[in-house]
Amino acid sequence: GLKALLASKGVSDHDMAELGLIAIPEDRSRRPHDFFRDRVMIPIMDKAGRVIAFGGRIMGDGQPKYLNSPETPLFNKRRVLYNLNNARDRAFAARNIIVCEGYMDVIALDKYGFGYAVAPLGTALTEDQIAEAWKVCPEPTLCFDGDGAGIRAAIRSIDRGLPILKAGYSLKYVFLPDKMDPDEFLKAHGHDAFLQHLQDTTPLVKLLWRKNTEGRVFDTPEQKALIEKNVMEEVAKIADEKVRGYYQQEMQNYIYNELGRGFWKNKRRESNDASGFRNSYRRTENRGQSAVPAAARPKVSMDELVLKFVLAAMVFYPELIAEYEERMGMFDISNAKLRR
C-alpha cells in the first residue's frame, strides 16, 4: 500500500500522518493504516500546480463514497478549488468558469471539452472560493444537478455569495434536467446540449426571488408582506452599498410585478383565452349562423369600453377599490347607466 511505499522511501509515520496520508489509531497497540485504502486517489493541487492533498473515491459500494485529505498545514479545503491550476488559462480564454459540485463532475466536463471547470472540496461553496473564481471570471457559472441536493447547494451558495457581491461581480446558475449530474447529462446528450444550457443561465438576483417565492402561496396581504420582509432581509446582508441599493430596487420591481399585479396578468391570460372563443364565434358568423348586421351593433367608444372593463374588475374584485380609488376619480363617466 501507500504507507509501505512511502516508508521504503524514508518517510516517517509522523510525516505521513501530518500530510493526511495515514491514520494513526488512538490505541497505540494498533498499527497505522492508509487513509485512502481501497480508493482511487485523485491529486488536489494548489494554483501553482503543486500537490497539496488528495481526494479518494471508493472502489465498490462502501461509504463514504468520496473522501478528501484532512486539513493540513498545506491544505485548507475552504480556500481551494479543485482544478483551478489547469482551468485558469482556459477560463480566461472562454471568458467563463464553471463551478461544479465535485471533482468527478470536473473530470467528466474536461473529457467533453469543458476544460474550464472547477469544484469545491467536500463543502458548500465558500466565500474564499467565490473570491478565487472571481479572480478568473467576474460572473462564474454555478452548475448543479437538478435534484434536491443540487437545489440545496445552490441555495447555500446564495447565502454565501450575497454578502460579498460587489460592482461587476456576481454569480449565475444552471440546473441540469432530469436530476442528472454533468457526467450523466453529457453521456446522454453530448457537448452541444450542455453548451446550450450554459447559454441559458439564471442570474443570482432572479434565483434569490425564486428561492423566496417558488412553491409558496401569496394570495393574502399577510403572505405578500412576509415574502417582502424575507426578501428584503436577505438583500440587507449585501455589504456593498451600491449593489445593495440596486438589489432593493430590483426586488421592489419583482414585488410590484408579481405580487401587486398578478391580478392583471391573470386578466390578460383570460382575455387571450376569450379571444380564441371570439375568433371561433366570428367564423361561425361567416358561415351565416346567427349573424348580426353591422349596422345593428351599437357603437361603443374606446374610452367607454376601457371604463366598462375597469368597473367590471371593481365589481368582481372589490379589494382593488381602496388601492385605485383616487385614480378612479379621474374617469369622466358620462354614461348614465355606468354612473349607477
Identify the function of each model-found stretch.
Residues 46-48, 88-97, 124-140, 144-340:
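A charged alpha-helical hairpin associated with nucleic-acid processing machineries
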Residues 2-140, 153-154:
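Phosphate-handling DNA/RNA-contact segment within nucleic-acid enzymes
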